[in-house]
Amino acid sequence: MTPLKEQLERLVSEMVSKGIRYEDAHREFEKKFIAYILSQSNGNLGKAADLLGMHRNTLSRKIAEYRLRRGA
């Protein structure tokens, strides 16, 4: 197993043992992932959308949904 898969396995196990639901984990992961990419792209929506593999409109909707800042 790769180090990343091992880390994920431990994280998932810990989250399940703490009663964290899939929906909550998914939302938090997506929020953090998008915030990181926005930061790396200096808030450039087009670049961030490309890096995320999603349409700019979808990214804009998710930024609003998660109340993220474009330059976050």
What do these predicted ranges mean?
Residues T2-A72:
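Bacterial C-terminal helix-turn-helix
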